Amino acid sequence: MTNNTDKQTLKKLERQILRKTAQAINQYNMIEDGDKIMVCLSGGKDSYCLLEMLLLLQKKAPISFEIIAVNLDQKQPGFPEEVLPNYLKNKGVEFHIIQRDTYSVVKRVIPEGKTTCGLCSRMRRGILYDFAEENSVTKVALGHHRDDIIETFFLNLFYNGSIKAMPAKLLSDDKRNIVIRPLAFVSEKETLEYSQLKEFPIIPCNLCGSQDNLQRVFIKDMLNRWEQNNPERKNVIFKALSNISPSQMLDKELFDFINISKDDIQR
């Protein structure tokens, strides 16, 4: 950070992100007294931002909770092994580096030129969930932000024929872990600017050489074009995700359409 203007910008932005993070945590009751929170730290801008916000809230919160930062070293070529340990030691944050060669597995299974992100993320999730259970973690914190949630909604809508996104809080399918997304109300624009001002030691996410998920790239570009024409478009879409009317949809599991009959008419 080079000047007073940058410092003032950082301070204002930090307060803004912290406020949104606290709102999401409170609204969805993400953190309870005595929680042990595992922050999944990839070395990307969003997970750095998440860790920073939780550390700030830890100092101010009326409840007590532990934080442990966990990184999975997947043995990708060129991965800078010293970056995260040095950063976390300097901050005085408890951390653990899990070392698992998923890179070789993914490269063996996925054909050349195909995106490896899907299999890689599933393997990563399983390893992190196992670590959380083995170390008595009560909440697994992920760095997904508002834009990730909106993009996932449209990915499912366009390509899977389903209406679903990313919840701010969930109990994993196997009931072993609770996953929280404290940055759910924060935009990617905010995490990007914050990471630049804080000068986080970013680790690229494409060390494996995988191609970007073209479907997600298409959705992201589409949303950005919409946002250019209407700066509130993403906010409106995000608001819609918590303003659902089951009776105005077509899902018989969410609303009892079958038993609506002429006997219900009131005149």
Curated annotation (Swiss-Prot):
The lineage of its organism: Bacteria, Pseudomonadati, Pseudomonadota, Gammaproteobacteria, Thiotrichales. Catalyzes the ATP-dependent 2-thiolation of cytidine in position 32 of tRNA, to form 2-thiocytidine (s(2)C32). The sulfur atoms are provided by the cysteine/cysteine desulfurase (IscS) system. Its EC number is 2.8.1.-. It catalyses: cytidine(32) in tRNA + S-sulfanyl-L-cysteinyl-[cysteine desulfurase] + AH2 + ATP = 2-thiocytidine(32) in tRNA + L-cysteinyl-[cysteine desulfurase] + A + AMP + diphosphate + H(+). GO terms for biological process: tRNA thio-modification. Homodimer. This is tRNA-cytidine(32) 2-sulfurtransferase 1. Pathway: tRNA modification. The gene is ttcA1.
